[in-house]
């Protein structure tokens, strides 16, 4: 999902639940008035889930690179657990906005538990 700078859902962000009843979206990222580089190399702002998704994906890729011992399901779980609505997910924000410093901490604990 996409949020604005106030962490409010945008009008163009899809909502859940999924057809099989799962919470959707999984998490949200910045998607309204996001600073981007345009085709001419200038900084501008643009909006859309096409901007929110790569931000979340890029941060998740960095997290997985830092925690290569975890599998895909564990990474998804860590990202969800780090989000600000983890305790009460809904079908507008999903699990909320991930906190990647918190995700790294949760992931490191998971790695240490797996080693025991």
Kindly give the residue locations of the regions a language model identified.
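Hydrolase catalytic cores
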Residues: 31-93, 97
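Generic alpha-helical secondary structure signal
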Residues: 16, 71, 97-99, 104
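Alpha-helical scaffold segments in soluble metabolic enzymes
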Residues: 11, 26, 58, 62, ...
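Residues at secondary-structure transition points
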Residues: 7, 22, 54, 100-102
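Intrinsically disordered, low-complexity, compositionally biased regions/tails
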Residues: 20, 62, 98-100, 111
């Amino acid at each position: 999902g996409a949020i604005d700078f106030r962490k409010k859902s945008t009008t163009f962000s899809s909502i859940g639940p999924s057809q099989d009843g799962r919470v959707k979206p999984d998490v949200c990222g910045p998607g309204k008035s996001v600073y981007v580089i345009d085709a001419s190399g200038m900084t501008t702002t643009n909006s859309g889930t096409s901007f929110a998704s790569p931000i979340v994906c890029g941060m998740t890729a960095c997290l997985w690179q830092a925690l290569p011992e975890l599998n895909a399901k564990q990474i998804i779980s860590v990202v969800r657990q780090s989000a600000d609505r983890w305790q009460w997910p809904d079908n507008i924000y999903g699990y909320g906005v991930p906190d990647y410093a918190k995700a790294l901490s949760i992931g490191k604990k998971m790695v240490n538990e797996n080693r025991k």
